[in-house]
Regions:
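Iron-associated oxidoreductase/ferritin-like identity signal
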Residues: 1-175
Length: 175
């Protein structure tokens, strides 16, 4: 009797569910958008002479680029075929120096929600590769939690009844 063994050859890209890949593609766009928003805030603060807040937002922009790169690296390392979605135009109307901090909190809340949506979808699909990657020490979920704390603290300082030089220096020290 001859037994034929048929094997399903699974590539890494077959392991990451298509729905998870779609959310990761969307997150690439979100990270680049957030980076551009933070660069816009950096320029705003530079133009009004608050160099500490320029540095703060340049660093925040770099963190967003780091997330973007981390997602690309994860997809590349797992041989995932993915697409770049167009990044929407960045139009920000800054009315006062508090606006950037309020918008930062909202952007970071949205980003946190997006990462947990990816996590929950990965969990639903038994995608343990993505779950492990998101939850590893210094992984995206841990970093995102830290960014949320920093954003809330920065907004709290920005709302204090102090001069902007003092507030700017205190906010920069959060990083």
């Amino acid at each position: 009797m001859k037994i034929e063994k048929t094997e399903k050859k699974e590539t890494c890209c077959d392991v990451i569910p298509a729905e998870v890949i779609k959310l990761l593609e969307e997150q690439l766009v979100n990270e680049m958008h957030n980076m551009r928003v933070y660069q816009t805030f950096a320029v705003y603060f530079n133009n009004i002479g608050l160099n500490s807040l320029y540095s703060y937002y340049k660093t925040r922009a770099y963190e967003e680029f780091h997330h973007y790169s981390n997602i690309c690296e994860f997809l590349d390392n797992n041989l995932v075929k993915y697409n770049f979605i167009e990044i929407p135009e960045c139009k920000i109307d800054i009315k006062n120096s508090i606006d950037p901090f309020e918008l930062t909190v909202q952007l970071e809340l949205d980003t946190t929600d997006a990462f947990y949506e990816i996590y929950e979808l990965a969990e639903k699909n038994h995608d343990y590769i993505t779950i492990q990657w998101l939850m590893k020490p210094n992984g995206l979920i841990e970093e995102q939690s830290e960014e949320m704390r920093t954003s809330y603290k920065a907004l709290e300082i920005a709302n204090m009844n102090l001069d902007w030089i003092s507030k700017a220096d205190a906010i920069l020290k959060l990083l």
